Design a protein with these regions (language model features):
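A metal-dependent hydrolase signature that marks the N-terminal structural subdomain at the beginning
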Residues: 2-133, 160
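Post-HExxH zinc-binding segment in Zn-dependent metallohydrolases
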Residues: 121-128, 238-263
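Active-site-adjacent "gating/activation" loops or surface patches in catalytic cores
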Residues: 124, 128-142, 196-211
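Long, intrinsically disordered low-complexity tandem-repeat segments
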Residues: 150-168, 174-196
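A structural signal for the main folded, soluble domain(s) of proteins
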Residues: 194-201, 231, 256-257
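Short pre-active-site segment immediately N-terminal to the catalytic Zn-binding motif
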Residues: 209-226
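Active-site recognition of the HExxH zinc-binding catalytic motif
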Residues: 225-238
């Protein structure tokens, strides 16, 4: 899994994304070892929880129209850790494509690829949910990480990060360039992302199950809380359309600073 040399024109080109994704998947356990029925039940409960959370959060916030818009336009996915890695790599690549970078050579690309792979893997065991808003239309678009992905990447906001450790849970997903798997392809709970045009909301089934078991939480309460938390961020993005572009701009400033510091 050695990165191949390529001409560097943006920060995204400093990373071999296929290798970074494979590295992340290779070091990350799939999740808790549980029966297939438990995996399916976790996925179904998260789907039911987010369906109820959007109108509930809209009523609480006094933003019912934004909640309805979010429900109609967002991609809402229940993913495994491999799916989260793939989705996170896709938005990070597009985000970094908006930042200029010098050619640091093959050695620098190898190091950067390993670092990104390590971060993607680490985050995939700790996030319970994540909202990825579409980038502002002003952002330059690079080559998509996944040929099937829609134009426009998404910086991550609204993370929930427990200190979670786990064993084996869901399928590691499909090939590195594929859309993130929904649920568990080994047990029939599997679907592909749809073509909706809004933000993407991810619920990470193995991490929700792991933290619920470790802390002995109510089987209904934790999925409901995670769904309500992420639904609130989704509604915020719909109520304030400028917010996604602002977040992307701030993240590019951070990426640009990191690239400059590494020269």
């Amino acid at each position: 899994m050695r990165p191949s040399p390529v001409p560097v024109s943006t920060a995204a080109d400093l990373i071999d994304w296929d290798v970074a994704v494979r590295l992340a998947r290779a070091v990350v356990p799939a999740g808790p070892r549980v029966p297939a029925a438990t995996r399916r039940a976790t996925v179904a409960l998260l789907r039911r929880s987010i369906a109820g959370a959007l109108p509930w959060a809209g009523r609480i916030a006094g933003l019912p129209d934004a909640a309805r818009s979010a429900s109609a336009t967002a991609e809402i996915l229940v993913v495994d850790r491999a799916g989260l890695i793939t989705a996170s790599a896709a938005w990070l690549r597009e985000l970094m494509d908006g930042c200029a970078a010098p050619d640091g050579g093959l050695g620098a690309r190898t190091l950067a690829t390993a670092q990104v792979g390590a971060v993607l893997g680490w985050l995939s065991t700790r996030l319970l949910g994540q909202v990825l808003p579409r980038l502002d239309a002003r952002a330059p678009a690079g080559a998509p990480f996944d040929a099937a992905a829609r134009p426009g990447a998404r910086p991550a906001v609204g993370d929930i990060r427990p200190d979670a450790r786990a064993g084996a849970f869901l399928s590691r997903g499909s090939r590195p360039g594929a859309r993130p798997a929904v649920g568990d392809s080994r047990t029939g709970v599997h679907a592909e992302a749809d073509s909706r045009t809004g933000a993407r909301l991810l619920l990470v089934a193995p991490n929700v199950l792991e933290i619920r078991q470790r802390l002995d939480l109510d089987v209904l309460d934790l999925p409901a809380w995670v769904a309500l938390h992420e639904a609130t961020h989704l509604i915020q993005l719909n109520a304030a359309p400028w917010l996604a572009g602002h977040l992307a701009d701030q993240l590019r400033v951070v990426v640009g600073g990191l690239v400059a510091a590494s020269r």
